[in-house]
Amino acid sequence: MKQAHICLDETLGIRYAILPGDPARLDRIAAKLEDVQELAYNREFRSLRGRYKGVDVLALSTGIGGSSAGIAVEELHNIGVQAAIRIGSCGALQKGIGLGELVLVTGAVRDDGASKAYVPAIYPAVADFTLYGCCVEAAKTLGAVTHEGICHSHESFYHEENEAESAYWSKKGVLGADMETAALFT
């Protein structure tokens, strides 16, 4: 059945997805794929398919925040996608994390609203260990500079307590801040 927001259905037969937030990032992803085909564009959800090293891959933008990312992942699940990797940016909370370096997230502080709609707040937001391990190995193979650990998922980009909140989580060893990971991991 065609999904309401991503406008895709199970006839795609794709099991793997890459999820940037920004629809414009799909152009950069498309440059790495073969046999690229634009699929749909509805609201923040732009999609394309292609092949990477012989494997069919779907790229789907999710917009900003856990609510829209949650919609994307639920609808991807409905059409048979079994693994998704979120790519994008985060605000670094630790010195020594440089632009372009990878933050590989093991878990998220659930300071958002979207993740709490799925499970109670006491439930941890943690990565799938198998998929996480694949990401670590791929990063090593590429020679990427990586930082592994926890991120802080929050609800709002701009609010008065943001600076104090960032300092607090930085002292706790949290690597970065975003708005999606907690929802995606629950």
Spell out what each predicted region is:
Residues 178-186:
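Short glycine-rich, acidic/polar surface loops and turns
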Residues 1-133:
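Metabolite-binding pocket within alpha/beta catalytic cores that recognizes anionic/polar moieties
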Residues 125-173:
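Active-site rim beta-loop-alpha module in soluble metabolic enzymes
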Residues 23, 91, 152-157, 183:
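Glycine-rich beta-alpha junction loops
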Residues 108-113, 169, 174-177:
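Acidic, His- and aromatic-enriched active-site or binding-groove loops in soluble protein domains
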Residues 86, 105, 147-154, 178:
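Short, conserved beta-strand edge motifs with alternating hydrophobic and charged residues
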Residues 47, 73, 136, 166, ...:
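Short glycine-/small-residue-rich flexible loop motifs, especially phosphate/cofactor-binding loops
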